[in-house]
């Protein structure tokens, strides 16, 4: 694992030692090399030799998320170049340092063996993200958004620490690898119900669960492009990853405690999809679509069958790439029209024809068109929830329909129709942006050829 963690840490001195005109080239190529090294983790031979030390390990669940994390750093650097071009050099370097720091924390979070170190790193990712949102956001509301983000996440995860200490007293270990062999079931008692709630709440706020999702649209809308990308693609997946890891030790509590949360997620996924249909703000629409996709992941994790686990993992990876791509597209529109309102930036297909092709591809993967991995994930979740209860097919069907509706609504509003008068002279799309979209799209298309590497540990 150190072959990925140490190069990422060394990205920080590289940033500060780079010359003014080489800063983007150095950091982007270097981080791309790191992501190519991390690809070897996906090839895990099917024996029990986990690539682990006492501190860090990777298994079929954490490896895809880890590769996604390393893959997104060069993409974030590529996306940030334009809006940082006016900033002084020291701020550019600070920005890249923050991204590298966040990357390091995320890699260590996804590979930690101890639950306490997982918790500490889970909280540590908060600091760079907060600095990125509150320092480089676009509007003054960014401070408000940062405050929401900080308090929701902190208040959600404080009970988790207490719960972890209590599990430590109960089992004598918090090691992921050892705790799977702890075969004593938790007895039914009020304290254990609260233990379950404390463990799950931290991750449900992070996911976010419908009802605890107020921080997400705020944070997304106010964050700069790299903040939005890392938030949508990776920080939401921390919640799913934590839930997948921690449900193993909470049996049999999950079997009856899951019902209210399952209902809330099934309801919330339809509600947030419907909210998307009424959005005027482009970034806000993409943020709400993230909430509705993550609700599917919560449903999948709580059903607790091998199929639903596979669906949850596939959906997390697929959504990470898709939503990140959508945020990049929204940002490239914003850099030209200086407005996130969809009505003011319509009809861009005539002005940016190549961007329209990327918009079409991104919208189609977002509505889970076959043969994308979004479809594979959704299909697994729908099938496992149908076998859990037949009525859920109505809710799932409604959700998939509304998802298709708002994706097409987004595509038609931004691309089709007559363009407004105030955007008659805008820059054409840069090679950098097209390369960025291609680097988002290629993994999505390639993974649909071989989806088994992202189906997690139950495949």
Swiss-Prot record:
UniProt-annotated location(s): Mitochondrion inner membrane
User: Any one Gene Ontology biological process term?
Assistant: electron transport coupled proton transport
What membrane topology does the UniProt entry give?
Answer: Multi-pass membrane protein
Q: Which InterPro entries match?
A: NADH4_N, NADH_Q_OxRdtase_chainM/4, NADH_UbQ_OxRdtase, ND/Mrp_TM
Q: What reaction does this enzyme carry out catalytically? A: a ubiquinone + NADH + 5 H(+)(in) = a ubiquinol + NAD(+) + 4 H(+)(out)
Q: What is its EC number?
A: 7.1.1.2
TM helices/strands, residue ranges = 22-42, 60-80, 95-112, 113-133, 147-167, 192-212, 224-244, 256-276, 284-303, 308-330, 351-371, 391-411
CC per GO annotation = mitochondrial inner membrane
Keywords per UniProt: Electron transport, Membrane, Mitochondrion, Mitochondrion inner membrane, NAD, Respiratory chain, Translocase, Transmembrane, Transmembrane helix, Transport, Ubiquinone
Enzyme kind, highest EC tier? translocase
* A GO molecular-function descriptor: ubiquinone binding
Q: Subunit structure, briefly? A: Core subunit of respiratory chain NADH dehydrogenase (Complex I) which is composed of 45 different subunits.
Q: Which PANTHER family match?
A: NADH-UBIQUINONE OXIDOREDUCTASE CHAIN 4
Q: Which family does it belong to?
A: Belongs to the complex I subunit 4 family.
What role does it play? Core subunit of the mitochondrial membrane respiratory chain NADH dehydrogenase (Complex I) which catalyzes electron transfer from NADH through the respiratory chain, using ubiquinone as an electron acceptor. Essential for the catalytic activity and assembly of complex I.
* Protein name in the entry: NADH-ubiquinone oxidoreductase chain 4
Q: Which organism is it from?
A: Equus asinus
């Amino acid at each position: 694992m150190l072959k990925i963690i140490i190069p990422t840490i060394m990205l920080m001195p590289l940033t500060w030692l780079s010359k003014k005109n080489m800063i983007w080239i150095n950091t982007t190529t270097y981080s791309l090399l790191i992501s190519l090294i991390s690809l070897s983790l996906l090839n895990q031979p099917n024996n029990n030799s986990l690539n682990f030390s006492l501190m860090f390990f990777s298994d079929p669940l954490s490896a895809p998320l880890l590769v996604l994390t390393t893959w997104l750093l060069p993409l974030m650097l590529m996306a940030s170049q334009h809006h940082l071009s006016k900033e002084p050099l020291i701020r550019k370097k600070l920005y890249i340092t923050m991204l590298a720091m966040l990357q390091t924390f995320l890699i260590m979070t996804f590979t930690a063996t101890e639950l306490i170190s997982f918790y500490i790193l889970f909280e540590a990712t908060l600091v760079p993200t907060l600095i990125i949102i509150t320092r480089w956001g676009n509007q003054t509301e960014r401070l408000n958004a940062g405050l929401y983000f900080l308090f929701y996440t902190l208040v959600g995860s404080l009970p988790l620490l207490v719960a972890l200490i209590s599990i430590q007293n109960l089992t004598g270990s918090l090691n992921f690898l050892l705790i799977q062999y702890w075969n004593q079931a938790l007895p039914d008692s009020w304290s254990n119900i609260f233990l379950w709630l404390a463990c799950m709440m931290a991750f449900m706020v992070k996911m976010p669960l419908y009802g605890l999702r107020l921080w997400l649209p705020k944070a997304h809308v106010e964050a700069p492009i790299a903040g939005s990308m890392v938030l949508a693609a990776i920080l939401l997946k921390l919640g799913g990853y934590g839930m997948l890891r921690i449900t193993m030790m909470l049996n049999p509590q999950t079997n009856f405690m899951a019902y209210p949360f399952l209902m809330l997620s099934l309801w919330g996924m339809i509600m947030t999809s419907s909210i998307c249909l009424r959005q005027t703000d482009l970034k806000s629409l993409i943020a709400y679509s993230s909430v509705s996709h993550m609700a599917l992941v919560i449903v999948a994790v709580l059903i607790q069958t091998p199929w639903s686990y596979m669906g949850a993992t596939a959906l997390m990876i697929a959504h990470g790439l898709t939503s990140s791509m959508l945020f990049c597209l929204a940002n490239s529109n914003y850099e030209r029209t200086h407005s996130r309102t969809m009505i003011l930036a319509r009809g861009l297909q005539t002005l940016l024809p190549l961007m329209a092709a990327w918009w079409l591809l991104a919208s189609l993967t977002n509505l889970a068109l076959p043969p994308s991995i979004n479809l594979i994930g959704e299909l697994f979740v729908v099938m496992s929830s149908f076998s859990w209860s037949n009525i859920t097919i109505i809710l799932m069907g409604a959700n998939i329909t509304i998802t298709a509706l708002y994706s097409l609504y987004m595509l038609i509003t931004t691309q089709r129709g007559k363009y407004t008068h105030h955007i008659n002279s805008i820059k054409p799309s840069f090679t950098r942006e097209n390369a960025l979209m291609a680097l988002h799209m290629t993994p999505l298309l390639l993974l649909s050829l071989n989806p088994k590497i992202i189906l997690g540990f139950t495949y």
